[in-house]
Amino acid sequence: MRYTSAERVAQGGLVAFALVFAVVAFAVLFRGGEAGPGASPTPTAPTISRAPDVTITQATCCKQTARLLLATWESSAHINAAKVAVTPDPGFECSASIDANGLKGTFSCRGLLKGATDYVANLQLTTPVGTFPFEHRFKTMGERLTDVKWFTEFEDPTGEPLSCAAASCRIIQNYTTGKDPLTAQAILDLGRQFNRSNDPGLDPVAIATVLQRMDASNHYHYYRFDTREDATGAAVYWLVRSGKPVMVISLAGQHGPVLMGFQGTFGTYYDDPSNRITGVVVEDPQRGDLNPQTQNHRPDKYRTAGFQTGQLIGLDEWYGDEWWLRFAYPASIKMPDGSFQNIERNDGAYPTPHWEKKFVILVDDGDADNPPDREGRVKFR
């Protein structure tokens, strides 16, 4: 069939009209009709999953970290779920928690991690828009703490040896906070008001209290044990658990060296069968003092610079020498004039005898709700 030129033009116009009609109909159909006066179509933006800002805080982190993992996290966005995985695998459960407000929480492990090991805690937090990973790296402490600065108890070389515990408080304060606000004498003067006994120096309550007064992040409490072996095992346990030095009350209640290391192995919990302690590493505020003017105090006991950086003491000496743990805490001590002075706790807070015939240590147990004048209450065995 043939068409004239006029017919072809008419057919082309019809096709063009149909095409325009189809385009308009398509637009109306898929835009839901014409918008009202003054309205504009709402653009559709792609969903953006942005990770929240998260801060992770871990005490003693990150080069000689406590072997008990306990860290806190805080998020800028509400968290619906949290979990953590630790590598290398410690062989026991690690978990994460969320506080009621959904903006912070903790993550921890059930046992002690291996010493001198690089770990990565992989924290996963879930918000309404997605799940996001956060990596926390740290290295656990080895058998001993390093960079524990030593201080003497003989700030006055001609003074009486009453500042041993105060000097050890200064050592602990400096290591745990990096600050050195008070001399041993100033710590002794400050701490005596907190004594709960007639101790001429600082008793266990005063030691714990003055450490917390100097820095609120320190939560030291005293613990009592029936045997020197149990006290030593607990001291090493708390050393590696807290990553902080331990003070041991020695010399029959009259001295307070700082335990900052051990020789041997310590497993994943207090009564771990693999635990083998063959020696302890201590700093001593008196026996590290090499000033000739102070040598008249206990000249029968050797002095060495090792007590300024950490002296290894074998268990035979540690258990058998009266300077260390040969004798338990007594009810009274002999004074320079030959008289005896009672040093038992006497404020009525506990039945007596309380310290007598016990081996006493002071540790940071992290128990912020327990006042420092109370005995430690954390169950660890």
Model regions and ranges:
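Active-site-adjacent structural segments surrounding the nucleophilic cysteine of cysteine proteases
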Residues: 139-200, 315, 322, 326, ...
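Aromatic sugar-binding surface patches on proteins
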Residues: 101-108
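C-terminal region of N-terminal signal peptides and the immediate post-cleavage residues
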Residues: 24-47
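N-terminal Sec-pathway targeting helices
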Residues: 2-17
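Conserved active-site-adjacent core of cysteine acyl-enzyme catalytic domains
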Residues: 186-347, 351-357
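Surface-exposed, short loops/turns at beta-strand junctions within beta-sandwich domains
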Residues: 110-118
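N-terminal non-catalytic regions of secreted/periplasmic and cell-surface proteins
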Residues: 39-83, 115, 124, 134-143
